[in-house]
Amino acid sequence: GLPILMVRFPDGKNVPYWNTFYQEIKYPVLDAQDIMQVAKVQYYKADLIAKKVNEEIAAGKKPSELSIDTFCKDSVVELLESKRKYLGQMDLNIKSPLVWEFYDETLKTLAAYGAKIVRLDAFAYAPKEPGEKNFLNEPGTWEVLEKVRKLADKYNLTLLPEIHASYGEKNYEQIAKQGYMTYDFFLPGMIIDALESGNGSTLEKWAKELMEKEIHVVNMLGCHDGIPLLDLKGLIPEERIQQIIDTVVARGGYVKDLHGQKNVYYQVNATYYSALGEDDKKMLMARALQMFMPGKPQVWYLDLFAGKNDHEAVKRAGAGGHKEINRTNLSAAQIEELMKTDIVKEQLKLLHFRNVSKAFGFDAELAVSTEGEIITFIWTNQGESATLRANLKTFEYEITDSEGIYA
């Protein structure tokens, strides 16, 4: 069934809304004065009731399930329900002209800010119909996407549809066939797997598939979310996915389950640097591999500065705050100091090289091969070339290029 959240309106009516993500209802913490306003009791009695209500709500009971005196229960339940708040991403009604006016204005504003690429987060949940599934309905998904693209074209914006699904479902191919770039959510886990096993055969296979099928991707190491795992199903054997999970968790990460289901993994939350054991050589190797894989590189700021797992931030965030492990705020002074470190300098060198070399691009040619623990990438374009030869056991790499940029 579709995820429905009942939203209470000021007139007391409960109205159903589609709410795909982060569906949570929060009730207020009551005090004695709140109880005294709705029930004819003295302060001492009101204080006891308030404490009992707060304790039971915190334990997960619904207001209607409270074990308090019947003479005041209806009033207290009404008070709680009237003041409840919601945590969620409310789904918009894509059949409403007002929503499309909002989309148009949003894209116009983003373009005015200088945006060139706009991510469409979880776009495949947008079209819904009673009796249909809640994800990637066809043809509705592609019709909505095309409608957004026409708006984006007015403002010279490129759309980047965001979708998480297992490799075996081939949804990334569907997006590419519709003419869109897509996220390479496979690469972060693949690189960890390659560096931990010393085997680059899966990276080679994936790079060749991207080139042969002309799939244009935006790739990454870490990001504002976790390191994707669900996506790897069908690409990497289950036992190796479990090894990635065990390794990252042993290094201080957290496992995020799919829709809260235990033992149905979705992602692991950790900084990429900590996921690699806070090893500078591994981090630089990972960045070099990213720069030479097909795609447009995206860089998460905390990876660039070799950020470590922020367990204190997770504690401060409370339940559901696992993502804060990889969202540490850095001060200008911290950044200034980190810019002096070798790991930051070398990453910036790699980024500069990837940005200015003519050897790379969606129109370039790539030859990739593995021999034992050695993986080699050779890019050629416009008469220029760039080569990465990387040892996945020692984490040593060598880059050469015809332009003499990387020196």
What is each PLM-predicted segment?
Residues 1-407:
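Active-site and adjacent substrate-binding regions of carbohydrate-active enzymes
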